[in-house]
């Protein structure tokens, strides 16, 4: 699945939300999150993010890896 990382915090442009064909992107208090159970890995969200915050999970930069778990926890606690 894809993961939204720190550049989204405070930005929340929402271009990705409109692009996602399966409505897997949900708004959190400070950023958007991608539901790993709904994400179909189509990558439609990645190029439309104006702050380049979206990565395929295996390509998340080392200093942003905490967002993989943060993303999972967001949906685990819903």
Swiss-Prot record:
Annotated [4Fe-4S] cluster binding sites: 20, 39, 42, 45
Keywords: 3Fe-4S, 4Fe-4S, Electron transport, Iron, Iron-sulfur, Metal-binding, Repeat, Transport
Cofactor(s) demanded: [3Fe-4S] cluster; [4Fe-4S] cluster
Pfam name, any one: Fer4_4
Cofactor stoichiometry and binding remark: Binds 1 [3Fe-4S] cluster.
List of residues binding [3Fe-4S] cluster: 8, 16, 49
Ranges for domain 4Fe-4S ferredoxin-type: 2-29, 30-59
UniProt entry tagged with the keyword Plastid: no
Gene Ontology MF term list: 3 iron, 4 sulfur cluster binding; 4 iron, 4 sulfur cluster binding; electron transfer activity; metal ion binding
Matching InterPro entries: 4Fe4S_Fe-S-bd (IPR017896), 4Fe4S_Fe_S_CS (IPR017900), 7Fe_ferredoxin (IPR000813), RnfB_subfamily (IPR050294)
Statement: the UniProt record of this protein carries the keyword Cell membrane: no
Known function: Ferredoxins are iron-sulfur proteins that transfer electrons in a wide variety of metabolic reactions.
Name this protein carries in UniProt: Ferredoxin
Organism from which the protein derives: Alicyclobacillus acidocaldarius subsp. acidocaldarius
Lineage per the UniProt record: Bacteria, Bacillati, Bacillota, Bacilli, Bacillales
């Amino acid at each position: 699945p894809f993961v939204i990382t720190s550049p989204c915090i405070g930005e929340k442009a929402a271009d990705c939300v409109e692009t996602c064909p399966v409505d897997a992107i949900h708004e959190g208090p400070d950023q958007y999150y991608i539901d790993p159970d709904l994400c179909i890995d189509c990558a439609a969200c990645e190029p439309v993010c104006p702050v380049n915050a979206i990565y395929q999970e295996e390509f998340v930069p080392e200093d942003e890896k905490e967002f993989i778990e943060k993303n999972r926890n967001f949906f685990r606690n819903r």
